[in-house]
Amino acid sequence: TYVHLPMIMGKNEDGSVSKLSKRHGSTGFSDLVNDGYLPEAIINYIALLGWCPKDNQEVFTLQGLAEHFSIDGISKSQSIFDYDKLTWLNGEYLRAMTLEQFTQLAMPSYKQVFPQTDLNWEVLSSILQPRVTKLNQIADMIGFFKELPEYSAELFVNKKSKTNLENSVTMLEAAIPVLERLDTWTVEAIH
C-alpha cells in the first residue's frame, strides 16, 4: 500500500488550470530558493498543497510538520500552486525570525548594494523585516540609498490628504525645523 499527495496544478493566465509546468513560473525547489523563498517555507507550502491539518494551522516548523502530519488529512482533489500564498507564507517565516537571523540572510543583498560599506545592518533589518516577503526583494528595496531614483512631482498630489504641488512645498518647509530639533533619529522619534 502506498499513499501520495494529489496532482499539483498551475493557474493559467485565462484562469483555467493545467498540470504545473515551467510556464507557470519556477517549479523546481532550487528555482524557488533562487527566487528568494526560504527552504522551510517551500516545504511547509508543499505539504499544505494536498493536506489539511486538523486545526487549520498553516505555519509549521519542520518538526511541527512531522508531528502533525497524518494521512487522514490528505485531500483527493487536485491542488493549485498559488505563488501568492507561497509568498505570504514565506513572509510569515521571515517575520518570525530573530533580527539577527534575518540580518544574516539579508547580508548578501546588503553587500550587493553597499559592497565597501559597514553599516549598522540590524537597524536596516529592523526596517525591512516587517516588509520583505522574499529575500530577492531586498536589493531593490534598498537600492535608492545608493542611487536616488527619479521621482515625479505627482508624488506630492493626494486628494485624500488634500495636498497639491503648491501646499506640499509649504508642508515640507515646515517639517524641516521640526526634524532639525530631534535629538535622535529613530523611527519612534520621527513619527
Regions found by a protein language model. Name each.
Residues 1-94, 189-191:
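Alpha-helical recognition segments enriched in aromatics with Gly/Pro capping
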Residues 99-191:
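Small-residue-rich helix-loop
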